[in-house]
Amino acid sequence: MKPTTESQQGRIDAVGRLEAAIGRPLDVVNVYHQWADDFPSASDFQFVQQGKILLISWNGNDIRSILSGSQDAVITARASAIKRLAEPVLLRWRWEMNRPNLQKSIGSAADYIAAWKHIRTIFTAVGATNVGWVWCPLATNFSATNGPSYYPGDDQVDWLCTDVYPGPTDASFASVSAEFMTWAAAHAKPIVIAEYGSESSNPDKAQWISAAAAYARGNSQIKAMVYFDADRVENGVDRNFRLEGTTGPLQAFHAMVTNTYFDQRKGG
């Protein structure tokens, strides 16, 4: 969810508004941090104190600079800070690495994998054992964008992950994620859907959300889903995924998250 004001309190308030709208606390909060950010932040600590699991989306630096060793101090500082948090954290470093517009900074798949292993080695040396490593490509055109080639290996990854967006044709969650889910079935790893959502321009947004929930219920490998409750402008186009201010979509999401299957407090 996007805060009204870009501040630590703004982030906390944004989560609180969404929780009030859906009628229950969130179990997982996806927090975004740039490469050089000092995190966990004050709002991150607050979310942990509220009993939420942090899914930290850590934006990647240029891969070549990571491999050169010039970023080791940054990596060590973040590993030490997360270790001090002393609570389980899901770490999603440089997600959507197969996205075409990221290829200049990513380099080759081999470079990406080497950087992943370099970062994880430093975290291990620091003793940040409370980290679950989340590998998260974009679901759209997973095979055509060579998504599988970026996989660091079962020994390097704790959680599989993908981001699912319907695109301009309002394609279903099932169809967009199909290639990734087929690939993931061959790996004995839990899956978190770290971002998913339908734009307000979709007249069937509520149905899309309900169908996504039904799909997840039918696939036991999916253990968590995080809705992308934000709006953003891309190439001059307003893309609004938000639930607040809607009726049908918000009701569909409320029905999903209060169902015992998705609400771990109710035994889901």
Feature names for model-found ranges:
Residues 42-52, 57-59, 155, 159-202:
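Glycoside hydrolase catalytic-domain groove-lining segments
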Residues 54, 89-91, 133, 191, ...:
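Hydrophobic/aromatic residues located in beta-strands of well-ordered beta-sheets
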Residues 1-88, 176, 204-220, 228, ...:
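N-terminal carbohydrate-binding/catalytic regions of secreted carbohydrate-active enzymes
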Residues 35-38, 61-64, 98-100, 140-142, ...:
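Short acidic, S/G/P-rich loop/turn micro-motifs used as interaction or catalytic elements
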Residues 33, 56-60, 93-95, 135-137, ...:
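A cross-domain feature marking catalytic cores of carbohydrate-active enzymes
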Residues 29, 91, 158-160, 195, ...:
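Conserved, mostly hydrophobic/aromatic
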Residues 71-159, 163-179, 186, 234-255:
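Active-site cleft segment of glycoside hydrolase catalytic domains centered on the general acid/base Glu
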Residues 183, 188, 262-268:
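A cross-taxonomic marker for long C-terminal extensions/tails that follow the last structured domain
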